[in-house]
């Protein structure tokens, strides 16, 4: 108990020695019998346990659990778990444990571990000479081994050199049960050809779980922790389990918010040293990772790996819902929101919701009226960088992406993807309200407003509202009188691009829209639609004032104007 208070970690209690003090460190090297858990366990009465503070009780648990793990490690075989260990793992008090609960376990011997170290050869050939050679350097030339000694637990060291040798073996008592030193001894005497095996590349130790091979038993034992949850480390905060204590330590910083690694250049702090190292490259501007295909350089190897998929066309991240594949996991995560319909990011200004935070950030620029991205060629400004990038291609005229079906070229792969749906007829975006499907997500978004009746885009000039931003843009031209779309054939100008497109048909004489009922042909689909009403007799446009119905909206407008003229003349 005094050891715990003073910060000294006892490795074991001297069992079988009358009057033995708990401070005494007795190693398995000096025992003739097999090593049991009793040899490395410490008992407390209720009074003794209550004398310890919380930190000391935690230290006791840590020492006992670590000793048990190391005992299993050194044994190299499965050891049934003592009740004390089960009690400690469950966070119960250990003072009420019976003595037999710790000692009634099958003995654990080192001999089994040592014999299994190397398949080709046991330890009996070189054990004596290595022990003498290793500890002879400490000034214990008179160290004697019992005749016929074959394993560690059969060593009989002279009592007169016990205290000095004990001091020599232990560099510090503050390190809990330094089994790595013992393992190093085992490795040295187990096979004189250990260095040769490292150079030959032989890996005689194979994991039965995953078939992975190792050249050293120590490495195999460490690897086994991945498969054995008993040796795992669990986060008390969230219950997440890790194979390594160092990984748990890093994970805990998520809960504590601790960021111990600080950049001296800009003061930014990080949870992991590796993240800080990566961050520092920003200040140096170094880009050590180069693409062999196109020569592009990156400051992170992960960025280069992702970039290479552009050349290979690899898309390892697949959506289980619709089968669509992506070259980045982040793109898949973003895509999945389409299926859930979730829109967690809401604009405080207008209430509009988005499925991505970046989209909300971009949307906010609309309210601010800010257009930070300006074209150096023509001076046109945009509120999205992607829009500026797309716009620049107008000046270069480049069209990298070609449709194999019709040969049409496009500036963007996304535009080509959308275009291909014309040939395939694919309409992946479906309205949950009415079941109507669309080939573009933007069309679905615009369509949904029909059901809500929402018109978020309002003209500041006249107050007229629209359900789509392009309609507002087209409307604004009425106030400005601007007619930017000019016909190259006759010079006539229009305020909307769609009107120019319709006008061009008059020059080429195209009459693609034909009505089978009367064989009459039209250059525009809208004109054909109006013509059909003549044959059906349908009059969908009603005048509320007179109760009259018309087959064309223009006739209704004319009727309304006529009514207002008559009213003004009266």
From Swiss-Prot:
Principal cellular location given in the protein's record: nucleus
Domain KRAB stretches: 35-107
Modified residues (N-acetylmethionine): 1
Record's subcellular location: Nucleus
UniProt-listed InterPro entries: KRAB, KRAB_dom_sf, Znf_C2H2_sf, Znf_C2H2_type
GO molecular function: DNA-binding transcription factor activity, RNA polymerase II-specific; RNA polymerase II cis-regulatory region sequence-specific DNA binding; zinc ion binding
Keywords attached to this entry: Acetylation, DNA-binding, Metal-binding, Nucleus, Repeat, Transcription, Transcription regulation, Zinc, Zinc-finger
GO process annotations (BP): regulation of DNA-templated transcription; substantia nigra development
Function: May be involved in transcriptional regulation.
Name of this chain's protein: Zinc finger protein 430
Provenance organism: Homo sapiens
